[in-house]
Amino acid sequence: MHIMEGYLPPMWCAVWWVLSGIVIAYGIVKLKKLLEESPEMKPLVAISGAYMFILSSLKMPSVTGSCSHPCGNGLGAVLFGVPITAVLAAIVLLFQALFLAHGGLTTLGANDFSMGIVGPAAAVIVYRLCMKAGLSSTVGIFFAALFGDWLTYVTTAVQLALAFPIPSFTAAFTKFIVIYAYTQVPLAIAEGILTVIIWDYIKKLRPDLLLKLGVVPEEELKPYLTPSPAGGE
């Protein structure tokens, strides 16, 4: 989904930079506060960023002027929310633009808006809906990763169609989203399965962090929590 350097008109580069910049700035404040108040979260933040970096670096060429790849943004979004995920995505996108020729600096705002903001927002909403429906967090994280990936690409298709509405926005959007769908539908399913594996490992290894973040019900985490000396949970 990374839109390559120089592909978007300057006006659209500026628009997406401004919109993403606002969220990133807020995310930096939230991330700083989180790490100051809960320094034990640092490894989990690092894992979320690394997961996003690795998955989103596995790119396959696309004729849209972009590329297809997993996003890895659902995990961080569910754990820490959209603003912090926007910061992690910005760091990932900056490294990829500078060292992997993946994306670009002028298009970083657009790429962060899709992969660091809209996709994560979709992941958070879907995860919360799954929790309200009484589903397990494992099921919730699968669908969060799935829809986080899909909505990232829907957003990129919208961005490309807005920049190049030929012959119309609707026609351009349809063209871009159909091309993406061939690779992204199966990729998102695979990403969902991989995210479940990572999630269940975190749940078994550090259930205390998930409990502190309030993203998994205590009842679901009880089998993994270490009993106290008095025999309590």
Curated annotation (Swiss-Prot):
Principal location class? membrane
Name the pathway it acts in: Cofactor biosynthesis; adenosylcobalamin biosynthesis
Provide the disulphide bond pattern: none
Please list every transmembrane segment annotated in the UniProt record, as residue ranges: 9-29, 43-63, 75-95, 107-127, 138-158, 177-197
Q: Where in the cell is it found?
A: Cell membrane
> How does the record classify its membrane topology?
Multi-pass membrane protein
Give GO BP annotations, semicolon-separated: cobalamin biosynthetic process
Please provide the record's keywords in A-Z order.
Answer: Cell membrane, Cobalamin biosynthesis, Cobalt, Cobalt transport, Ion transport, Membrane, Transmembrane, Transmembrane helix, Transport
Q: Which InterPro entries match?
A: CbiM, CbiM/NikMN
Q: Does the keyword Coiled coil apply?
A: no
On subunit structure and binding partners, the annotation says: Forms an energy-coupling factor (ECF) transporter complex composed of an ATP-binding protein (A component, CbiO), a transmembrane protein (T component, CbiQ) and 2 possible substrate-capture proteins (S components, CbiM and CbiN) of unknown stoichimetry.
Regarding protein family, the annotation reads: Belongs to the CbiM family.
This chain's function reads: Part of the energy-coupling factor (ECF) transporter complex CbiMNOQ involved in cobalt import.
Output this protein's name: Putative cobalt transport protein CbiM
- Give the organism, scientific name: Methanocaldococcus jannaschii (strain ATCC 43067 / DSM 2661 / JAL-1 / JCM 10045 / NBRC 100440) (Methanococcus jannaschii)
